[in-house]
From Swiss-Prot:
InterPro entries membership: TBL, TBL_C, TBL_N
Recorded superkingdom: Eukaryota
Species name: Arabidopsis thaliana (Mouse-ear cress)
GO BP of this protein: leaf senescence
Residues passing through the membrane, by range: 25-45
Transmembrane recorded as keyword: yes
Family: Belongs to the PC-esterase family. TBL subfamily.
Record carries keyword Membrane: yes
Membrane topology according to the record: Single-pass type II membrane protein
Cellular component GO terms held in the UniProt record: Golgi trans cisterna; membrane
Protein's name in the database: Protein YLS7
Motif (GDS motif): 211-213
DCXHWCLPGXXDXWN motif (motif): residue ranges: 467-481
Length: 501
């Protein structure tokens, strides 16, 4: 309704009864009255508009929030690479886990909330469109860490599927602040993980985590987040962990693949028994065989390239890690180069698979934080209770070069002309720099519930045995799955809105 509009039924008749001059005066008076009423309404509603703006964009709630910025410095010089800097890798674990008898109370779970509240009346249509674009396309991987007093969405006691070595609170870690830091991209918000939204987006689909023990770390984080709204059914076996959510027919799976490429132990050339051989140009056949069963795959690898292995390319031995018996022959490929080749191999093979059209997410190198030495030379992350402050990121030459080779291998695969539109289903989840700040998120010496474990440095300053590679749960690793959910949302909703879909 237009403000101060005259009632047509009476006013129109009245005007026609007056002479022309009188009717003109009447119109003038009516227009003046309309202007006064409209101006009064604007003055009256201004405070209300301010209140609405304050409600949606309140600033006092962020006054006490601490921000730790992730600062990208392209001029950083990586330190020399040494295989001794590589972190330890746990032995391949068995997948035949028994279904935990966990209980959950939905009243204690803080899930991401969706609201039907309208936007402030001060936001124009163009501004709304700009905000939607930013929310959909913004860079998730450059931003800052901020302290969130709400804390995590689960506890070590509310998730029965937790590898004990990552159960930091259960293992006696005295501080808990590391659980409260959340990631904030520079251009948008990364929503809290919403388990119900995830299960609805993935309805009838399967998400698989494929990789080493750090991939298991991420998979267990995903399970802990989902377990808060529904207890799944264990449908796994020794070859593959599988958890089924009845309400939405969603399956979460995990496959162990140390290197993501074909491996074998039989003698090859001058490489005898007792050492693992890797065909860098052949994908792990178990992954390829299982691919048609998956709709989304989260890949990760790299840390096993610190272990002893032989590298084979084009059916020729070209290098090795901690192995090269014939010093008279030159090595063509080291473990860093081998890692990059393996990434390109598996990404191309998945993208070209005739029976796999799913979304592939490659999570980049997960940084370790062995400070003062390597994992086997006195490196430590003991006593770290919050993220590194802005600008204080400690460079690690091995981390930087491994991340570079991984990203290069991915982009080479994506650039393959033979992939066509299938390259759009390949996503790089680049977490390395952001998580370089999270030296506080590792178990450190709190790797077991043993009350007699050593957690302090000895008289000679020697640190206790510790894990500065994997992540506490709950902890920073949960952010990875917030990113996974956002990538899935963008892909699925983008397909629904695409005319060609």
């Amino acid at each position: 309704m237009t403000l101060a509009s005259p009632r047509v039924s009476n006013s129109k008749t009245t005007v026609l009864l007056f002479p022309r001059k009188v009717s003109s005066i009447a119109f003038a008076i009516g227009g003046l009255t309309s202007f006064v009423i409209f101006a009064s309404l604007l003055l009256f509603t201004y405070p209300i508009g301010s209140s609405v703006t304050d409600y949606f964009y309140r600033t006092e709630t962020t006054q006490n929030v601490q921000f730790h910025h992730s600062i990208h410095d392209p001029d950083r010089n990586p330190s020399p690479v040494s295989s001794s800097e590589s972190p330890p890798v746990l032995t391949q674990d068995s997948d035949d886990k028994v279904l935990p008898k966990g209980s959950h109370d939905s009243n204690d779970v803080r899930l991401g909330e969706e609201t039907n509240s309208g936007k402030s009346s001060n936001v124009s249509i163009d501004e709304e469109a700009t905000q939607d674009h930013v929310e959909t396309e913004c860079d998730l991987y450059h931003g800052n860490w901020f302290y969130d007093p709400m804390g995590p969405l689960y506890t070590n006691n509310s998730c029965p599927l937790l590898t004990q070595m990552q159960n930091c609170q259960g293992n006696g870690r005295p501080d808990k602040g590391y659980e409260n830091w959340r990631w904030k991209p520079s251009q948008c918000d990364l929503p809290r993980f919403d388990a119900k939204k995830f299960l609805e987006l993935m309805r009838g689909k399967t998400l698989a985590f494929i990789g080493d023990s750090v991939a298991r770390n991420q998979m267990e984080s995903m399970m802990c987040l989902l377990w808060q709204v529904e207890t799944p059914v264990n449908r796994g076996n020794r070859k593959m962990q599988r958890w089924y959510f009845r309400s939405s027919s969603v399956m979460i799976a995990r496959m162990w693949s140390s290197w993501l490429v074909h491996q074998f132990n039989e003698p090859f050339g001058f490489a005898t028994d007792g050492v693992t051989k890797l065909k860098l140009d052949q994908p792990d056949e178990r992954i390829i065989e299982a691919l048609p069963n998956f709709d989304v795959v989260v890949l990760s690898s790299g840390h096993w390239f610190a272990k002893q292995s032989v590298y084979i390319l084009n059916d020729q031995i070209v290098g090795g890690q901690l192995w090269w018996p014939d010093k008279s022959k030159p090595e063509k490929i080291n473990n860093v180069e081998a890692f990059g080749i393996s990434v390109e191999t598996i990404i191309k093979a998945m993208a070209k698979h005739p029976n796999y059209t799913g979304l592939t997410i490659l999570r980049t190198w997960s940084p370790d934080h062995y400070e003062g030495g390597a994992w086997n030379t006195g490196g430590s992350c003991t006593g770290k209770v919050e993220p590194l402050p802005p600008g204080n990121l400690v460079t690690n030459g091995f981390t930087e070069i491994m991340h570079e080779k991984q990203a290069t291998g991915f982009h080479r695969a994506v650039a393959d002309d033979k992939l066509g539109n299938r390259s759009k289903k390949l996503k790089l989840m680049d977490i390395t720099e952001a998580f370089g700040y999270r030296h506080d998120g590792h178990p450190g010496p709190y790797r077991s519930p043993d009350p007699k474990k050593i957690t302090k440095r000895g008289p000679d300053g020697q640190p206790p045995p510790q894990d500065c590679l994997h992540w506490c749960m709950p902890g920073p690793v949960d952010t990875w799955n917030e990113m996974v959910l956002e990538i899935i949302r963008r892909d699925f909703e983008g397909r629904q809105s695409s005319p060609s879909s």
